């Protein structure tokens, strides 16, 4: 679902964590109810690196620290065109669908909820977004990250297409 990317060392970056949400979960056992917590954290340096992590624990602080550590393990490098994205993309993760459109300088981040948190952590300043389908914060955040990692440089894509067309003509 999400694109594979090269491993990024988090110790070399100045990362900031943002807590997207905390979920209280209950497990019913013979003796009663067991409470636990799940946290979703996005971490980024504001300079094209971002990661999302989920942590689960009996206490809130340990769930947040586990989520932060998980986000640092899942860092991705994002391709940007100045302060916005290079092209429009619609990405789907589960039932969540996110539309990311480039915007003119000075537009700002037109997004809400977990989409905004991921985009701010990435360092994007101008973008238009639309979240469709389900409103599950984890799936929306993962769809946003998936869309950002699926971005390709238009110039590189054009040169690859031209070279493959030349190979087709020469070989066929």
Curated annotation (Swiss-Prot):
Entries under InterPro entries matching the protein: Ribosomal_Su5_D2-typ_SF, Ribosomal_uS5, Ribosomal_uS5_bac-type, Ribosomal_uS5_C, Ribosomal_uS5_N, Ribsml_uS5_D2-typ_fold_subgr
Source species, domain of life: Bacteria
Assigned GO CC terms: small ribosomal subunit
Entry-linked Gene3D superfamilies: 3.30.160.20, 3.30.230.10
Domain S5 DRBM: 15-78
Keywords: Ribonucleoprotein, Ribosomal protein, RNA-binding, rRNA-binding
Membrane-spanning ranges: none
One Pfam family matching this protein: Ribosomal_S5_C
One GO MF term attached to the UniProt entry: structural constituent of ribosome
GO biological process: translation
UniProt keyword RNA-binding present: yes
Purpose of the protein: With S4 and S12 plays an important role in translational accuracy.
Recorded family membership: Belongs to the universal ribosomal protein uS5 family.
Quaternary structure (record): Part of the 30S ribosomal subunit. Contacts proteins S4 and S8.
Domain remark text: The N-terminal domain interacts with the head of the 30S subunit; the C-terminal domain interacts with the body and contacts protein S4. The interaction surface between S4 and S5 is involved in control of translational fidelity.
NCBIfam families tied to this protein: rpsE_bact (TIGR01021)
Protein name according to UniProt: Small ribosomal subunit protein uS5
Organism per entry: Dehalococcoides mccartyi (strain ATCC BAA-2266 / KCTC 15142 / 195)
């Amino acid at each position: 679902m999400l694109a594979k990317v090269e491993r990024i060392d988090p110790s070399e970056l100045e990362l900031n964590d943002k807590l997207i949400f905390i979920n209280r979960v209950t497990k019913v056992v013979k003796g009663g109810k067991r409470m636990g917590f799940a946290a979703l954290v996005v971490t980024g340096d504001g300079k094209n690196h971002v990661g999302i992590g989920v942590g689960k624990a009996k206490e809130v602080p340990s769930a947040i620290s586990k989520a932060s550590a998980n986000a640092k393990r899942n860092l991705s490098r994002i391709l940007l065109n100045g302060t916005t994205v290079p092209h429009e993309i619609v990405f789907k993760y589960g039932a969540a669908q996110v539309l990311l459109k480039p915007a003119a300088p000075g537009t700002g981040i037109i997004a809400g909820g977990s989409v905004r948190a991921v985009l701010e952590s990435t360092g994007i300043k101008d973008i238009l977004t639309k979240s469709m389908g389900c409103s599950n914060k984890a799936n929306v955040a993962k769809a946003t990250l998936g869309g950002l990692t699926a971005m390709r440089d238009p110039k590189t894509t054009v040169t690859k297409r031209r070279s493959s067309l030349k190979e087709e003509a020469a070989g066929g």
